Amino acid sequence: MAFQLTPLRVALVAGEPSGDLLGASLLGGLHARLPASSRYYGIGGPRMSAVEFDAHWPMEKLAVRGYVEALKHIPEILRIRGELKRQLFAEPPDAFVGIDAPDFNFGLEQALRGAGIPTIHFVCPSIWAWRGGRIKKIVKAVDHMLCLFPFEPELLEKAGVAATFVGHPLADEIPLEPDTHGARIALGLPGGGPVIAVLPGSRRSEIELIGPTFFDAMELMQQREPGVRFVVPAATPALRALLQPLVDAHPSLSVTLTEGRAQVAMTAADAILVKSGTVTLEAALLKKPMVISYKVPWLTGQIMRRQGYLPYVGLPNILAGRFVVPELLQHFATPDALADATLTQLRDDANRRALADIFTDMHLALRQNTAQRAAEAVAHVIDSRKPR
């Protein structure tokens, strides 16, 4: 390609941990594909920073979930976007890659595209599930979409948006056969009774809303299944500090609280109770039975319900096109209901085997060498815009 010997500048913006994972994967591919002296900068997290990315702002500044919750953060978010836009206009990159975070990135991408800067968006918003009107924003903002799921490019191309299915880096990273025994050894949980991983979210607001309910459900599960053990991974030291009082308030629970190591915790588990999000896909790739749940403030929930198209919210169910694991959302997410559903997932061996087959098929479909495919797509966009 024309730029083989020319250093490039690629700006990227990720707004939450799942985007940081995707960004790190893409950066790995770009380092292998583009000239060694190329520069990568913008907004990202620790995974991206670990692969020679210059984070001008930490992604935590953008990690706000929900309509109502975002209102108080709007001034700072707009200030950051304005400063970043001025930087990118002053020194235009060869390409801009927005990684998820559509509410932040689409407006920025539209402005950059209008200035002649190639725009790529990594992660197609779930227009097939809710807020389908966003396709109009995509058409205005995005030159090329990198899609995690195989059915997405056709939807975008019908609207006139170029798109490439690149798979999911988690499917490349996670082995087809999880090492449950090795994970238990790593966590200090060899032998003993069954293990349930409990993941109440990766944001303070999520844990504050659903954490107490999850811990009450754990108390009920231990009463109904003596010998059961729990492992709760906290995404950050701050979230571990937030979870510790919940552990202290339930002294009879057999619970291991870890910092990070969510994948190890899920690998060690016989079943998982998990807040809806990308982590549910990770649980599926680990072939684990699970119960998916969430709670959001009432107004946010009403808006989401009115704008939704599908009867399910969890990625395993969306990818399967049907309910393969239970979902207990909002007022249905009671401690008693969560305990019953999770113990059913734990005890039903026939269901466990059926889920393993379903999740293996998903795994194989998403295992596409995402880093290489995504980097090739970005390189193609850059090359197509270079003067000949």
UniProtKB/Swiss-Prot annotation:
Catalytic activity of the protein: a lipid X + a UDP-2-N,3-O-bis[(3R)-3-hydroxyacyl]-alpha-D-glucosamine = a lipid A disaccharide + UDP + H(+)
GO CC terms in record: membrane
Alphabetized UniProt keyword annotations: Glycosyltransferase, Lipid A biosynthesis, Lipid biosynthesis, Lipid metabolism, Transferase
GO biological process: lipid A biosynthetic process
The UniProt record lists the keyword Nucleotide-binding: no
One example GO MF annotation: lipid-A-disaccharide synthase activity
Superkingdom of this protein's organism: Bacteria
Top-tier EC class: transferase
Pfam families associated with the record: LpxB (PF02684)
NCBIfam families for this protein: lpxB
Family: Belongs to the LpxB family.
Role: Condensation of UDP-2,3-diacylglucosamine and 2,3-diacylglucosamine-1-phosphate to form lipid A disaccharide, a precursor of lipid A, a phosphorylated glycolipid that anchors the lipopolysaccharide to the outer membrane of the cell.
Cross-referenced PANTHER family: LIPID-A-DISACCHARIDE SYNTHASE, LIPID-A-DISACCHARIDE SYNTHASE, MITOCHONDRIAL-RELATED
UniProt name for this protein: Lipid-A-disaccharide synthase
Organism: Burkholderia mallei (strain NCTC 10229)
Lineage: Bacteria, Pseudomonadati, Pseudomonadota, Betaproteobacteria, Burkholderiales
Gene designation per UniProt: lpxB
